[in-house]
Amino acid sequence: MQLHFLSIVSQKEIMRFPLLFLCLLSVQPLVAEDYPPGTFEYTPRVDLGLRPVVVDRLPERTLNLPAGFKVRFFSGEVNHARFMAFDENDVLHVGNFNTQRSGYWHKDPWRDATVLAMPDFNRDGQADRVYVAADDLQLPHSIAFYKGHMYVADHDKIYKMYDGDGDGYYEQREKLISVPGIMNRPSEHITHTLLFDEQKEKLYLHVGSGCDLCREDDPERATIMQFNTDGTERRIYASGIRNAVGLDLHPITGQLWAAGHGHDREGRSLPPEWVSIILPDTFHGWPFAYAYRSWIDFSDPVYSKEILPITAQDSALVRKMQRPTVLVDAHLGPMGLHFYTHEQFPQRYKNAAFIAFHAGTGSSFDPGYKVSVIFSNPDGTNARIADFMTGFRPDPDKGFYWAQPMGLVTDSEGYLYMSSDLVTPGIFRIEYDPQ
């Protein structure tokens, strides 16, 4: 097992206090759960011994997976595939942005975006056909099925959809919830992820910030919201969350986990991206701090103009921050977060969390563009992270990448599906065959 240790001082501090830095290197690295406020540790890494595997139905492409795993290209009949969900008949559905005319990060004024259905009734690992299950949408990022209905998160509302005649097309809808939508501001976050907690009969919804770093006028931005499943009892469940696209419930504890994005303007290595257990009424740092109470560098004139002065209330919020469960390299863009609960994969993956990293640009030390897996105790302690599927960026020293991991989901048989929204839009299926 390979452990990565992060110095708790910046490069400027190393230059100012070289003896202090040498002392830090001479002591044992802190356990990831034990580091003090104002510092942070990257989560230790595990090496799964990835091997090259040719992608079935994409013979010109190779990905790297642990021994015994293989990957198929399930379908490429999609414009920009976002998050996925299976209905009660085990038919895969995927949110499909149609941005050929409107631009990728703008709502579609023609309302050409759709939800696509991709049945695989003969179970050969390839979609039998692809058809429109719902249309007249703008940015349908996230989908969920609950008690026979399909729920779709568009940029400004959550729809509850009905398939009255059972033909697979959801011809009726009602607006369940209105949410903060697009404001056409720089660096705003425009998608929403929804998640049902069937045990507690609650609905969670991530609402990203309307900027990279600023003081929001709308208290519901940069939060995770909670509702009853009928849309009532609206409340802010947790705040200080710039953009937590990945949401899932731990299969043992039932606790909400989220994967979040850090701010943009603090260099190649800061701030780390994170995964955390999200408890009710907690604050997670934005726009003042990151990781475990590490203050943002407000010497940046853009940030200082937006945030300063820091108030006593701001400081009190930062003092409430808890250590994240997982910290990884900056700017990797964590997207889908999915706990694996099936038996098809080896036992070590049972109840582990898979996470899709959508980015890994020149601003990051990690090549990115990959799927990783988090191993931990149910309460998040003793967390370790491992690369599970890499190769979308074949040469880390070059900018070329041929797909961007987005969503993750499993079917009833335990196959893992990954969507890619750009370069090679489509759905990939990962399966385990030790032979």
Q: Positions of the model-derived regions?
A:
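Residue position within the beta-strands of beta-propeller blades
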Residues: 93-95, 152, 204-205, 258-260, ...
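Beta-rich catalytic cores
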Residues: 80, 111, 129, 139, ...
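Beta-strand-rich domains and repeat architectures in extracellular enzymes and scaffolds
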Residues: 40, 49-58, 72-101, 333-336, ...
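Beta-propeller domain segments
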Residues: 34-66, 191, 209-212, 222, ...
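Residue-level detector of Asp-centered blade-edge/turn motifs that repeat once per structural unit
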Residues: 87-89, 145-147, 196-200, 251-253, ...
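Hydrophobic core register within WD40 beta-propeller blades
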Residues: 84, 143, 194, 244-247, ...
